[in-house]
UniProtKB/Swiss-Prot annotation:
MF terms (GO), sorted A to Z: formate C-acetyltransferase activity
Domain of life: Bacteria
Naturally occurring in which organism (per UniProt): Serratia liquefaciens
Residue numbers bearing the Glycine radical modification: G102
Keywords: Organic radical
Ranges of residues in domain Glycine radical: 5-127
Pfam families, per the entry: Gly_radical
One GO cellular component term: cytosol
PROSITE patterns noted in UniProt: GLY_RADICAL_1, GLY_RADICAL_2
UniProt-recorded name of the protein: Autonomous glycyl radical cofactor
Functional note: Acts as a radical domain for damaged PFL and possibly other radical proteins.
InterPro entries xref list: Auton_GlycylRad_Cofactor, Form_AcTrfase_GR_CS, Gly_radical, Glycyl_radical_cofactor_GrcA
Length: 127
């Protein structure tokens, strides 16, 4: 179990008012902040701190989210009619951006053939 502490009394005065995370299972202490000889995130054996008195400091633990493997979802939020109108009236859609092969591109910068291909591949009647 991890316990947060603030050292209130110690043989080594540099430790007074420093903050640590104590790991009871490993008998280690991780420095959160201290003056002097200990660096932030430095890990030492609890016995290296010597004789100390401390007060516990409440900890707020946030669960770690782990994603392995990953998923990808490509969501199209356009209608076929919007892209067809952009082919006919490009001046109405100067900022229309689409994704092609993993990168973003302005629809109007594509050739007419590429635009037709995007429309054909993006909107199908059935799978």
């Amino acid at each position: 179990m991890i316990t947060g502490i603030q050292i209130t009394k110690a043989n080594d005065q540099a430790l007074v008012n420093s903050f640590w995370l104590l790991d009871d299972e490993k008998a280690e202490a991780r420095c959160v902040c201290a003056n002097g000889q200990y660096a932030e995130d430095q890990v030492v054996a609890v016995s290296d701190l010597g004789q100390i008195e401390y007060r516990e400091v409440p900890l707020e633990m946030q669960p770690t989210v782990r994603v392995e493997g990953g998923q990808h979802l490509n969501v199209n939020v356009l209608r076929r009619e919007t892209l067809e109108d952009a082919v006919k009236h490009p001046e109405k859609y100067p900022q229309l951006t689409i994704r092609v092969s993993g990168y973003a591109v302005r629809f109007n910068s594509l050739t007419p053939e590429q635009q037709r291909d995007v429309i054909a591949r993006t909107f199908t009647e059935s799978l």
